[in-house]
């Protein structure tokens, strides 16, 4: 990695501002999934072992900005952090201002302080309009560490502006290093071959950039989920009432043509679980794509033959990247295809398997096989943008590695 690492910093007795991604699902004050908190712990534990004073900054959700909203408070994160650390973690009721400055001043080496949601201030998301927000955050610390890969595709103050105020002192945390290693080295730079990318999800248009980027480096491209029906329509297949982006059909045709020119093998569903609607998961059946899906029915998951086809492609690959479910995984039995993909990846222990965050990561967790995947990214949109562009605003801006 060509960026400064926390291993390169002289941390004893120093204050370190750490941008973490604690944007976890919270319901009724309880955290539903703490994977992102757990993923940041190696960096936090390391800093504490080095006798640094650790100041954590994060966001949760999408508050309006400019006002405190209890629904988006980081308060529910405190007991989870305390459970991992084994000691009290104070929460500053604001991330800037006198109350935050006092909390930082009182923070001792070897302890952790959590600042309240940075998105309660407009200066976080609109740093060009209010540069003072970044300046105030930066004033707290001697060093800056970015361990928030999942947010690093955004040019927000705590990710992009603040590190610019730490010349030669803005480093990557361990989670960030791991993300860059797997998405960069193992996928973009030196993938073991054959290299297969599996892309699902609803909309093709939101992933066209990463599709075109992947065409230049993969051997196989598996396309399914809602976007798969747009490609099938582009091939003049009858898909009934399945989700199709009409405006995306010309783009899909261009992708198919480019793949053929580059020698990339495209794999699309050959059958589907169909129903009139997916709400209840009832009255479904499997139909062949060759025969076509009639009007009045829509595909909500891949069928048994497609599972077998995709599994064979996976088993014959040495590197696999997966982003986006291949069906409506929230509604059984339309979860079977996505779970089968997850289990197939998990069983292929000799391959490098990378799951690109978001819904695919949720499926892997539901299937109970996350620990058997080489790397489950903490960034959905961030992982796709990194694969498309090769870097992110929040990673580009970090200090260069020491020579």
Curated annotation (Swiss-Prot):
Pathway: Carbohydrate degradation; glycolysis; pyruvate from D-glyceraldehyde 3-phosphate: step 2/5. Its main location: cytoplasm. Its EC number is 2.7.2.3. One of its GO terms (molecular function) is phosphoglycerate kinase activity. Transmembrane segments: none annotated. InterPro entries: Phosphoglycerate_kinase (IPR001576), Phosphoglycerate_kinase_CS (IPR015911), Phosphoglycerate_kinase_N (IPR015824), Phosphoglycerate_kinase_sf (IPR036043). GO terms for cellular component: cytosol. It is found in: Cytoplasm. This is Phosphoglycerate kinase.
């Amino acid at each position: 990695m060509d960026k400064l690492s926390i291993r390169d910093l002289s941390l004893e007795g120093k204050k370190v501002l750490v941008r973490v991604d604690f944007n976890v699902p919270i319901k009724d004050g309880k955290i539903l999934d703490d994977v992102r908190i757990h993923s940041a712990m190696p960096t936090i534990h390391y800093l504490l072992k080095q006798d640094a004073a650790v100041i954590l900054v994060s966001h949760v959700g999408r508050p309006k900005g400019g006002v405190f909203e209890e629904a988006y408070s980081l308060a529910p994160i405190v007991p989870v952090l305390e459970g991992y650390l084994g000691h009290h973690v104070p929460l500053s009721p604001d991330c800037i201002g006198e109350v935050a400055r006092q909390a930082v001043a009182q923070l001792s080496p070897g302890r952790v302080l959590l600042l309240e949601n940075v998105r309660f201030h407009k200066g976080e998301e609109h740093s060009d309009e209010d540069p003072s927000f970044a300046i105030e955050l930066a004033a707290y610390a001697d060093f800056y560490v970015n361990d928030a890969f999942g947010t690093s595709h955004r040019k927000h103050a705590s990710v992009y502006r603040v590190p610019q105020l730490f010349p030669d002192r803005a480093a990557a945390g361990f989670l960030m290093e791991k993300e860059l290693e797997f998405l960069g080295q193992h996928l973009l730079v030196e993938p073991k071959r054959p290299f297969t990318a599996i892309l699902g999800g609803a909309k093709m248009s939101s992933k066209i950039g990463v599709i075109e980027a992947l065409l230049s480096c993969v051997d196989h491209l598996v396309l399914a989920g809602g976007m798969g029906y747009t490609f099938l329509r582009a091939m003049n297949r009858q898909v009934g009432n399945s989700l199709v982006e009409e405006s995306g059909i010309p783009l899909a045709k261009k992708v198919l043509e480019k793949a053929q020119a580059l020698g990339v093998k495209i794999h699309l569903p050959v059958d589907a679980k169909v129903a009139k609607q997916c709400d209840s998961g009832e009255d479904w059946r499997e139909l062949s794509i060759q025969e076509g899906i009639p009007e009045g029915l829509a595909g909500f998951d891949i069928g048994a033959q497609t599972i077998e086809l995709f599994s064979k492609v996976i088993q014959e690959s040495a590197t696999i990247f997966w982003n986006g479910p291949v069906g409506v995984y929230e509604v059984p039995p339309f979860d079977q295809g996505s779970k089968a993909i997850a289990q197939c990846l998990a069983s292929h222990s000799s391959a490098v398997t990378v799951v690109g965050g978001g819904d695919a990561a949720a499926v892997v967790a539901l299937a109970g096989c996350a620990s058997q995947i080489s790397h489950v990214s903490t960034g959905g949109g961030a992982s796709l943008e990194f694969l498309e562009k090769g870097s992110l605003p929040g990673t580009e801006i970090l200090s260069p590695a020491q020579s």
